[in-house]
From Swiss-Prot:
GO biological process: cell division; cilium assembly; neuron projection development; regulation of cytokinesis
Similarity comment text for this entry: Belongs to the ataxin-10 family.
Gene deletion effect: Embryonic lethal; mutant embryos display gross morphological cardiac abnormalities or developmental delay, the walls of the heart are thinned with an apparent reduction in trabeculation. Mutant embryos also display neural tube defects with a thinned appearance which may result from a lack of cell proliferation.
Protein name as annotated: Ataxin-10
Organism: Mus musculus (Mouse)
Main location: cytoplasm
Omega-N-methylarginine modification, residue list: R10
GO CC entries: centriole; ciliary basal body; cytoplasm; cytosol; dendrite; midbody; neuronal cell body; perinuclear region of cytoplasm
Length: 475
């Protein structure tokens, strides 16, 4: 039975039960704090009373942690704890005065300790799960837009709370914990993550498991990607699937509606170094898919995603210049293009041109566009860059690119990317134009194919000239 209550009294404009001792009183406060005017006029004494109830109820949880047989007696305490957290959570909404009052009572430390106790219980009770969720919601709200509260939350919660909750089986607990981490992180605290990489990896895993949850995604895109040091340290410890997840977010950042700022560009140049080196080290992993065509090799899929990132990076004019002079990158791209082109000709495999659509789950679908993206990357690297134009010629890359122009369902838009690459290879480069013109004269390049691609060969005296017409397909 609920303890008897004194008649309600008015405190600073809010009708509250006095003293606050029972569940009904807490529920009344929770409802009152849904209104902004009530939050703004709440006296600090209310939060002291709520904290007293929270501390008293915590003893039952501590006892259950020491003696599992006591878990069945937790129901009433969990109800009170839940309502305390709801009350405090609501009180903090867009009200820095209440956030400060609650923080100064050391309620944050009590709440974090209690949440960690919940994780220790490891029992399946809906009431426990609800209290757990409400506790995390309170910590998120008390820290929201309040730097002092964020600092206190970080002191108490890092690293134990994040280690305990980011991998919790309940998706709401993962989401609320991610909200706390997102709210509390800043440049200085990112250094703490570098020393606790498992937390950063858990965030990647959380996004992988719960892609619909916005908080893990925002942590990665808005915090992790601003720290090249963290990304590099973390990348080496990620599983292949986690690497794919991270690279997908890098792509999302590159192609997003918001353009990269100057600060972003300097950071992404560092990321570009990691991506380019990783691709150069692993690019031949795609060949594993030819020996085991029914196996989804994650290493190969990472290589495919690395190429996708490089294509998007070189589509950004601010990042292009850095990658155009990246040592060994062009050579490696030409090398892997030549290898998969030859492998595709030798026997029927996933790199052979196909005129039939594949089911989404097929491994052919996983490698879709790889060859055309290699040609796209070559075209990007040659954009207004004579050194790279000449390098492709020296590596016999021009015949290779022209020979890759067959229609291929595994490589949509192959023709368009070949045209794009040829255009960038020959722009203001008479030597490369001569190479293609002579290939046509010698029968090594199909004139009808060149015309279809938007080029034609004209004779001027003893010279052959490659010209583009107005019907060049768009890239």
């Amino acid at each position: 039975m609920a303890a008897p209550r004194m008649p309600p009294s008015r405190l600073s404009g809010i009708m509250v039960p006095a003293p606050i001792q029972d569940l009904e009183a807490l529920r009344a406060l929770t409802a009152l704090f849904k209104e902004q005017r009530n939050r703004e006029t709440a006296p600090r004494t209310i939060f002291q009373r709520v904290l007293d109830i929270l501390k008293k109820s915590t003893h039952a949880v501590e006892l259950a942690c020491r003696d599992p047989s006591q878990v069945e007696h937790l129901a009433s305490s969990l109800q009170l704890i839940t309502e305390c957290f709801r009350c405090l959570r609501n009180a903090c909404i867009e009200c820095s005065v209440n956030q400060n009052s609650i923080r100064n009572l050391d309620t944050i430390g009590v709440a974090v300790d209690l949440v960690l106790l919940f994780r220790e219980l490891r029992v399946e009770q809906d009431s426990l799960l609800t209290a757990f969720r409400c506790g995390l919601q309170f910590l998120g709200n008390v820290a929201s837009r309040n730097e002092e509260s964020q600092s206190i939350v970080w002191v108490h919660a890092f690293p134990e709370l994040f280690m305990s909750c980011l991998n919790h089986p309940d998706k709401k607990i993962v989401a609320y914990c991610s909200m706390i981490l997102f709210t509390s992180l800043n440049a200085e605290r990112m250094k703490d993550l570098e020393e606790n990489l498992n937390i950063a990896i858990n965030v990647i895993e959380a996004h992988q498991k719960h892609p619909a949850s916005e908080w893990p995604f925002l942590i990665i895109s808005d915090h992790f990607l601003k720290s090249p040091e963290l990304v590099e340290a973390m990348y080496g410890k990620l599983s292949n699937q986690e690497r794919i997840t991270l690279l997908d977010i890098v792509i999302a950042k590159l192609v997003g509606e918001e353009q990269l700022t100057k600060d972003d560009i300097s950071i992404f140049v560092r990321h570009a170094e990691l991506i380019a080196n990783s691709f150069m080290d692993q690019c031949r992993n795609v060949l594993k898919l030819t020996s085991e065509p029914h196996t989804e090799d994650k290493e190969a899929l990472v290589t495919i995603r690395l190429l996708d990132v490089l294509c998007e990076m070189t589509s950004n004019t601010e990042l292009l210049g850095y990658l155009q002079v990246f040592p060994g990158l062009m050579e490696r791209v030409i090398d892997v293009l030549r290898v998969i082109h030859e492998v595709g000709k030798e026997s029927t495999n996933i790199f052979s041109p196909s005129d039939s659509l594949k089911a989404e789950g097929d491994i052919e679908h996983m490698t879709e566009g790889f060859k055309s993206h290699l040609i796209r990357l070559i075209g990007n690297l040659c954009y207004k860059n004579k050194e790279n134009q000449d390098k492709v010629n020296e590596l016999d890359g021009i015949p290779l690119i022209l020979d890759s122009s067959n229609i291929d369902d595994n490589n949509p838009f192959m023709m368009q990317w070949v045209v794009y690459a040829v255009r960038n290879l020959t722009e203001d480069n008479s030597q490369n134009q001569d190479v293609i013109a002579k290939m046509e004269e010698q029968g090594l390049a199909d004139a009808s194919l060149l015309k279809k691609m938007g080029f034609e060969i004209e004779k001027s005296g003893d010279k052959l000239i490659l010209k583009s017409n107005n019907d060049i397909p768009p890239p």
